[in-house]
């Protein structure tokens, strides 16, 4: 079988993951991460030919600078690899009601992504930058760009999960409902959990926790999403890096009426100044919170609120499992690496039969998967996500 090399771009709110993947066998030829956008330490790391490299992007750099570096520095050193690219796959957080599966990028698709910006104000603009840069840098692949939507996996949610208790006309006429996010990741780790448990995906009941700068929990019953913590936008749900997650909607009225904040100021507060950043008043980085948990009140406060919220979601989703929960799965940058988050969260769920194994938990970090609970416990797993592989496979399939 001939190779099908796909350039995968995953533009997050504060980072950009990229890879060249052979969609036929999953082999990664180049992979990397640009992170700490808008901060002094903005940087890019990548792996090629077994070697690791790193470079500073410059203080305050973001998506455009990172993409320029990828095209003009990294790929420029591998012209033969660039010449073999057959498609470009883009991770898109929000497709609204318009997109229920992956699609080839057209002007209509770009407009649809723009129309969904109010639903994903941190992410969709970043995705559009990625698409624009890809179209500019690879004109020979102009009709081979594919958008893969994080909202697609959640389209199986039943009405009782996706509807808000608002006038029904707001859903019918304006699409105001719960959509979820991180669907590509939740789908991937569900597939992997099924393999580990030696079960068909359609018989699998798991609760998947994708924890990164953004975070969400998904209830997967019989292999399909039946509920998820993010809502109309990626602002609902868990405590995140800079996002508040769930809060009393009347707080917004209070901030506006009693404190004189404008709608734009409130939007900025909830999406960019809250979460771990708001609770610590120092940083959105979970590594700071974990490293300083025992010594700094701000770190302990942030960690405790973060894990309390996460445990509540996991606990509530057990009610949707029809009496059988096969495992809880942790993934994403925090889920895969923050052993303390996993331990503090599962310690709150002893009633459900979870008992952490400290040594296993510490071993399952830095890209390593594994069981993190004792043999006598209900199962909890760490499974490193691979959204890029799912995106590459979809891109190859649609452009074949």
UniProtKB/Swiss-Prot annotation:
Residues the record marks as site: Transition state stabilizer: 182, 243
Subcellular location(s) per record: Cytoplasm
Source species, domain of life: Bacteria
Cofactor(s) recorded in Swiss-Prot or TrEMBL: Mg(2+); Mn(2+)
Pfam families: Acetate_kinase
Binding of ATP, residues: 17, 210-214, 285-287, 333-337
GO cellular component, one term: cytosol
Class of enzymatic activity (EC top level): transferase
The protein's annotated pathway: Metabolic intermediate biosynthesis; acetyl-CoA biosynthesis; acetyl-CoA from acetate: step 1/2
Binding site for substrate: 91
An annotated GO BP: acetate metabolic process
Catalytic residue positions: 150 (proton donor/acceptor)
Keyword terms of this UniProt record: ATP-binding, Cytoplasm, Kinase, Magnesium, Metal-binding, Nucleotide-binding, Transferase
UniProt remark on cofactor binding: Mg(2+). Can also accept Mn(2+).
Catalytic activity entry: acetate + ATP = acetyl phosphate + ADP
EC number assigned by the record: 2.7.2.1
Family matches, as InterPro entries: Ac/propionate_kinase (IPR004372), Aliphatic_acid_kin_short-chain (IPR000890), Aliphatic_acid_kinase_CS (IPR023865), ATPase_NBD (IPR043129)
Quaternary organization: Homodimer.
HAMAP family assigned to the protein according to its UniProt record, in alphabetical order: Acetate_kinase
Role, per record: Catalyzes the formation of acetyl phosphate from acetate and ATP. Can also catalyze the reverse reaction.
Protein name stated in the entry: Acetate kinase
